[in-house]
Structure formats: structure tokens, C-alpha cells
A protein has these predicted regions:
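Bacterial N-terminal signal peptides
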Residues: 11-22
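A short helix->loop->beta-strand "cap" motif at the edges of active sites that frequently abuts
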Residues: 144-148
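Substrate-gating cap/lid alpha-helix
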Residues: 157-194
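Bacterial N-terminal signal peptides that target proteins for export
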Residues: 2-13
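Residue-level recognition of beta-strand->loop/alpha-helix junctions
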Residues: 75-77, 153, 192-194
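Hydrophobic positions in alpha-helices of CheY-like receiver
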Residues: 136-140
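Bacterial Sec-dependent signal peptides at the C-terminal "C-region" and cleavage site
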Residues: 20-32
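Conserved SGNH/GDSL esterase-like catalytic core that processes O-acyl groups on lipids
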Residues: 33-39, 45-134
Length: 194
């Protein structure tokens, strides 16, 4: 075999090995598992209002620490947000809702309803609550058809809170019942935060 032919053959083999290695590495990178996205949708409780250093201690941050690197947890909490579309601060009109849709969560934890106990909201729009809740779920499902829903019961209203004193404890109970009904209707999981 001549020297030139040997070098040509060796070059072809090296080129083949290089191409094979490059393709294998590219395929391996494509097989890298993407993290499971968890969208935490809610109000000030989700946001972390009142928590010292909320960027490190809000429940979505704590959830991220518990779940680890295989998950990506997004905090889409909006202080004062109502679930009701006709409420005083509808979640669906907030930037956080648009961000939650763009996030395309694989899991959506929804913790809304506490601000709907406001006298401006529940007495006037209670009949829209189930429909509005299911509509939010439908929007999140449109962003990711395989989304898994986890609905959170509302946290208690403190007995010193003005809404408790004003008699909205009954409304709180009615909303709690509605959330349980929504979980049953939709097949979503139901959890407590307390």
C-alpha cells in the first residue's frame, strides 16, 4: 500500500470516527431530560407576602429545594388576586397569569380563592366561581395539554382578620366546598397547605 493511500485511508477512518462521535454526542445531548415544570399559581400566599426574605422562603422556593434539580418550580403568585373574573383583581388579568401560561407547567398547583371572600366579590359573583376556576384550568391545559392539576384548599382566615370579623367565615367555607367540587369534577388532586 502506498504512503498516500495509507494516509487517505487513515484520514477517512479518523473522519468517520469523528463524525460518529459527534453524532453520538449530539444524540446524547438531545436525550438530556428536561426538568419537570411546576407552576405555582396563586395570590399573596403563593407570592410570599409577609415572609421575611420571600425569595428564599416562599412556598414555591421551599418546594424547589425539596424537589431538587429534576424539577423547575415557578412562582406565579399575585398579591390580592381573585379567582373570580369579576373580582376586584382577577388573576386572569395579571401578568403572572400570562407568565404561568408561557411557562407551560407539567404540574399546576392552584391556590386561589381567599381574596374572593372579599365583600366586593363573593356576594355578587359566587355563582361564577366554579366556571371561572375551570376556565383557568382550561387555559393552563391549552398551554400544556398534559398538565397535572393539584388544587389547594384555602388556608384559614385568622380570627383577627377583618374579613373574619365581618362574617365572611361562611363565604370561606362555601369557597372551600366549591374547590372540593372542582377537584371532583375535574379529577384534579386536592391538597392542604396547613
Amino acid at each position: 500500500m502506498s504512503k498516500n493511500r495509507f494516509h487517505t485511508t487513515l484520514s477517512a477512518i479518523l473522519l468517520g470516527v469523528f463524525c460518529f462521535t459527534s453524532l453520538t454526542l449530539t444524540a446524547a445531548r438531545k436525550k438530556t431530560v428536561k426538568p419537570i415544570k411546576v407552576a405555582c399559581v396563586g395570590n399573596s400566599i403563593t407570592y410570599g407576602t409577609g415572609i421575611k426574605d420571600r425569595e428564599h422562603f416562599s412556598y414555591p422556593v421551599q418546594l424547589q429545594k425539596m424537589l431538587g434539580d429534576k424539577y423547575e418550580v415557578g412562582n406565579f403568585g399575585k398579591p390580592g388576586a381573585t379567582l373570580l373574573y369579576h373580582g376586584h383583581r382577577p388573576y386572569v388579568q395579571q401578568k403572572e397569569f400570562k407568565d404561568a401560561l408561557a411557562f407551560k407547567g407539567d404540574i399546576a398547583v392552584i391556590h386561589l380563592g381567599i381574596n374572593d371572600t372579599d365583600p366586593r366579590n363573593w356576594p355578587n359573583y359566587r355563582d361564577e366561581f366554579v366556571k371561572d376556576y375551570l376556565s383557568i384550568m382550561d387555559s393552563l391545559r391549552a398551554a400544556n395539554p398534559k398538565v397535572r392539576f393539584i388544587l389547594a384548599r384555602m388556608t384559614p382566615i385568622a380570627d383577627r382578620h377583618p374579613r373574619f370579623i365581618s362574617g365572611t367565615k361562611l363565604w370561606h367555607d362555601e369557597i372551600q366546598d366549591a374547590i372540593e367540587t372542582i377537584a371532583r369534577i375535574s379529577g384534579a388532586e386536592l391538597i392542604d397547605f396547613h
